[in-house]
């Protein structure tokens, strides 16, 4: 998986990689040539007292060193550019794919693990790419070239290489084989600690309200300790790599000096050749060390690549059709459900069964029912946040699955049950509700705020009023009104309010509904509500109970003909004659 991921995302940088490899090749060859020049200086210059040879070869050595340094600097620069671009592209690919996920895929992975995979996991692979960029050509050429040059200098001592290099390779392989499962566990534990932190921060009010700080501390401590222990185990194995490598290099160097000294003493080898052989021996083992350091990063990067590939290979449940359809004259807002049935993944029973209804432009359809009856799921099907498992949802006679999702959603103004606001300003959040090509003016923003009865509390600091993440610096009712204003900005063909007035007092609720009727015009309005006072004003009321429609009609007819609706109304102490605003 790691290789496939690297190959896919490194492709745009092939030219940079080719230049990088060329510079590394020249730099490595220059490094391999230096010990030979040094040996010649010792044997032909110093040993014979030939100053001219020393100066001439010294100049050559200086020139080769300069070339090696320049090429090395260029290789580092290109490697950094390649790594930075690779990391940017991989993060973008993750983000672009994740935003296509429906609630099903998001819930399957969980927000904390998606955040970890998009940031920490990408960082681990980027680290591997940057390390690989420095050893991609250097290590193999230095190793092979060093062996060739060492044999050229003194073939009789090459048996030391045949002993030391395999020992080093086998030892490092043994260490890495133990590190891989530990790194896989570490990434899972990082997800866990992020999940605990997210829960604690998101539910800080609940934690304090129930004085559960101690419990949360213990839960975090357990997750933190588990991660720390896994990291310690992996670190212990990783820490073995450098001592093993150093021990092998030092022991091999001592053996080389010993046996080389014996050959010099017997006149079979010159001092310069021993110095050159030592240099090549060090270069060979250094190449193995560089490869080892890269291999130390490889296990964790491999695990991260598996996790990233899992996300990127997960298809979005709500894909776009090959040949999307769209009404010739634009969306007018006729919404029809024909035998719609929906079952959540893994559930035994459908949450909605055989739902059929029609909502027309210029009318308001209220959907009422007890908690858990399936009201929110029903409007999620209309907005195509989920796809039906049977039946169909049609907008202007076209199945919503045949629309391009962006064009469908641009025709719908949704105010969800939980009104989420993005960090920034009020103006930023209102612009978020604009159409793809819509330039939202300040006048339109203030008009939307007026419709949502939100202009009063925004008036003090204006449109630049700061909004914290999630809108936590506003009350529940204020968040709902800002979310309503955001939906109004677009002037969509279909308005969907999923219990979006629950935090408003009766007076503000009535004011917002009156303003919505004025600006909605011929738009279709679908309201999920728990308030009979809201349902009483609707042109059509749909009563949902246990996933089925048990009543359809006006407020008055349902009071007479639908026991479920009558009980619902009675529970709110509303008389059978109510027809106006409650």
From Swiss-Prot:
Residues reported to bind ATP: 369-376
Name the principal localization, coarsely classed.
Answer: membrane
GO CC annotations, alphabetized: peptidoglycan-based cell wall; plasma membrane
Q: Where does the record place the ABC transmembrane type-1 domain?
A: 17-300
Among the GO molecular function terms of this UniProt record, one is: ABC-type transporter activity
Q: Where is the ABC transporter domain?
A: 335-571
Transmembrane parts of this sequence: 17-37, 57-77, 131-151, 156-176, 239-259, 271-291
What's a GO biological-process term for it? Answer: transmembrane transport
The source's superkingdom equals Bacteria
Q: Where in the cell is it found?
A: Cell membrane
What does the UniProt keyword field contain?
ATP-binding, Cell membrane, Membrane, Nucleotide-binding, Transmembrane, Transmembrane helix, Transport
Q: Name the membrane topology term.
A: Multi-pass membrane protein
Q: Which family does it belong to?
A: Belongs to the ABC transporter superfamily.
- Entry protein name: Uncharacterized ABC transporter ATP-binding protein Rv1273c
